[in-house]
A protein has these predicted regions:
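Alpha-helical transmembrane-bundle signature of multi-pass membrane transport and export proteins
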Residues: 1-300
Length: 300
């Protein structure tokens, strides 16, 4: 996303186009995860991960080739991002559904936090490496390196120990989705969690899309600086995950979720008005930390 955002802003010089690209990714993620969750309950999850990871690798390779051949247009990026979100709508609930099957219930919150470390570690290291390499080797090479990063995933999947999948009869998918929504909206706690998550995602994730604008126009830095900005939330996420996993005592889930989402939004306000690079980095570290605490809490 770091490279894609910089590429779009460099091609268009328009924050509006960054918004369009972001919308192309966000739109499928509004509706499709409901179906992704149902699919994850009905199919062999290891097979699903093979399919989704292969799809993401293929899309990454397509974008890398377009950039390398100097054929890339904004609409290409929009299509790739949209299709990537469709794949992620199945991949994400599948990965989340795997975690509870691997650990006892009592360790679930810690397991979710450690699960976040894996992906947050990528969010920490990936953008920084991309920002450092891009000026030296070019955007296309960085995108090809991203494609190569899927290789360890394909090596690890056969080693994943999961309960044996037992095929069985299921009701129609649409009915399952409808029943799931009906169940969710008859539980006050679930409604609150969904609304808080939706609001924080809608208004709190725009900094990721607009990071190239902040980097170049506000903080007066280049793609290397953008890489550090994009890595900062990853560092915070890793710290937050380790804090949850190692804590001997934590407040009740509801209270912890409320404090963390409030702090998350306040840190974002601070980032929005900051014109100091170092302060912006620190605020984004805090954003990543609090977002991980909130996510791990509500999933528990």
């Amino acid at each position: 996303l770091t490279i894609v955002g910089w590429l779009v802003f460099d091609m268009t010089n328009s924050p509006a186009w960054l918004g369009v690209v972001g919308a192309s990714r966000a739109a499928p993620m509004i509706v499709l995860p409901f179906f992704g969750g149902v699919i994850a309950d009905r199919m062999d999850r290891r097979l699903l991960l093979w399919i989704t990871q292969s799809g993401q690798a293929l899309l990454s390779l397509t974008l890398a080739l377009l950039v390398a051949l100097d054929l890339v247009l904004v609409w290409h990026i929009i299509v790739v991002m949209c299709l990537g979100a469709v794949v992620e709508a199945v991949d994400q609930p599948t990965r989340q559904a795997i975690v509870p099957s691997l650990v006892p219930r009592i360790d679930l919150r810690k397991a979710i936090a450690l699960h976040a470390v894996v992906f947050s570690g990528g969010a920490l290291v990936g953008p920084a490496i991309a920002g450092l390499l891009a000026p030296a080797v070019g955007l296309a090479t960085v995108l090809f390196i991203n494609v190569a990063s899927f290789v360890p995933v394909f090596i690890a999947l056969p080693l994943l120990h999961l309960p044996r999948f037992e095929p069985r009869q299921h009701e129609p998918i649409l009915k399952s989705v409808r029943d799931g929504l009906r169940f969710a909206f008859t539980r006050e706690l679930i409604i609150v969690v969904i609304l808080v998550s939706a609001v924080s995602s809608l208004f709190g994730r725009s900094y990721q899309l607009l990071a190239p604008v902040f980097a170049r126009e506000v903080l007066l830095t280049d793609i290397t600086g953008l890489g550090w900005l994009a890595s900062a939330p990853g560092l915070g996420a890793v710290l937050g995950a380790f804090a949850i996993a190692s804590a001997r005592w934590l407040p009740a889930n509801g209270r912890l979720a409320g404090f963390s989402v409030a702090g998350y939004l306040l840190a974002l306000v601070g980032f929005a008005i900051s014109n100091n690079f170092g302060l912006s980095i620190l605020l984004l570290v805090l954003v990543g930390l609090l977002n991980t605490v909130f996510s791990a809490t509500v999933r528990t």
